[in-house]
Amino acid sequence: LTNLAYSATAPYNCPKSARILADAVKVISNMTFKSSGIANPVLGLAKLAAGITNDELKTYANSICPATGSLQPLVYYDSWTWAYNNIFLSEYFLLTGDTSVTNGIREWTSSLAEAQSMYGTLGHHYTENRHDGTHGSAWGYGPMHACSIPAGISIVLAKKCGIGHPEIDPAIDRLGKNESYYVDKGGLPYGEHAPEL
């Protein structure tokens, strides 16, 4: 592999790129879901990208589907893991059509949409609603783009899966308005900071 050069069209029509990808697929196909945090759903996404949809993947997908009403965001909330679990389940459903995960997608999606701040962002803690019942501010060190973007992507993917919930469209709209502020100003910062240049 070290003696192979990348072709001018790399990664397309490139023997070295093809070899790297084939080797990566071998490694990914042998990995199991033993990690914590976002590592497992990201591994699941890598397996999906490699075309792996075996029983192990189905078992993992079903294992991260929360029962309806089981998420207690005021007690436990992890915006990163929730977002990546939902991205994985949505992509898994879109690729396989396995309806056994739709209730899980619905639960993650509704909880993430309800967790959003009035600006469409997520924080380290679940957003508490204001007295009138509308979304309040992100709290627990403030909002973070680093988890708000994956959560927003997961909500859009869930809608593509046919998941319906009254919070979905407003959540997409809130996040879109927030992120559009950064257009032509620089890259998205980690949290509520000036645009990165």
Predicted regions and their residues:
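Preference for long, amphipathic alpha-helical scaffolds in soluble/luminal domains
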Residues: 1-197
